[in-house]
Amino acid sequence: MITCHFINWDKCLSHQIWPAITKGWPDTDKPVHFFWGLAGNNVKKIKEVSDKGEEWWFVDTGYFSMPIKRYPEPMILDKNKTYFRIVKGKLHTIRGKVGTGQRLNELENKGIDVNFKGWYTGDTKHILLCPSSPTVTYHINGISQEDWIKEVTSTLKQFTKREIRVRNKPRPDNQWWGTDIKDELKDCHCLVTNMSMAAIDAVMNMVPVICHTDNVVSPVASHDLKFIEKPLRPGRKTMNEWLKYVAENQFTLEEISNGTAYRVLQEQNI
């Protein structure tokens, strides 16, 4: 039995996504839950279904996609170029099979940047610290976002003398609103995060990453802050395989509705 947990706000994108899920996902006697983000009571509900041992899937914005408009209310600007990730039992995709490259090529043909450009080889300067939202940080790390920033900064200073800059997720009421992370990735030595998808921006703009092991970038990143001066920089073959793998884990509304998402995810034995 499929249960789609709606957010109690009629503008929430879940109201567009859940009809696609119920149409494209086979319904069985086994309980299967779908959650959109961690808003509302989703954190509590996810814990409840996990404690029962029931299957649950996390749905949120895609990894390589045309951005949605977020403010003043969320809006899909181009359904053909907007992708959503569907992840079993976690917030990010961290396991699965490397695809053939067909889905990756489709993204490229749509004008979505999926081209690995290598790594900076010249002098680098600062470290960019990009925390996840307060909700995700507490869910993953069990501490506030502020405490996470303090702890990580303190630990980094044991291993580097580089400038440490903090960049939060842009919101209308903060200093990063209207800014582009690419500007802060220039001359950046390494981006450090827990679960932020800023990690994707980094590796796609020649900057290595240190992140939580549950971050989608985890397979091509370092995980221990002691490696800050020499973070992992995988070769092109590894990065291209990672890109193919990630492309197998995000889907358009049409692909969710017509069963493509279910089929592709089942082929990966997730």
Outline where the language-model segments fall.
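Donor nucleotide-activated moiety binding/catalytic core segment of transferases
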Residues: P26, K157, R162-V209, D214-V217
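Catalytic donor nucleotide-activated moiety binding site of glycosyltransferases and closely related
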Residues: T3-W9, C130-P131, T135, I143-K182
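Short, well-ordered secondary-structure micro-motifs within conserved domains or adaptor modules
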Residues: P26-D60, C188-N194
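Leloir-type glycosyltransferase catalytic cores
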Residues: E73-T124, V220-I270
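Short, solvent-exposed loop/turn segments at secondary-structure junctions
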Residues: W9-C12, L38-N41, G62-S65, S132-V136, ...
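N-terminal pre-catalytic "stem/leader" segment of glycosyltransferase-like enzymes
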Residues: M1-K44, T135-V136, R263-I270
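A basic- and aromatic-enriched beta-loop-alpha substructure that forms the phosphate/nucleotide-
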Residues: K45-N105, S196, A202-M204
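Residues that mark the start of a beta-strand
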Residues: M1-T3, V32, K125-L128, V207
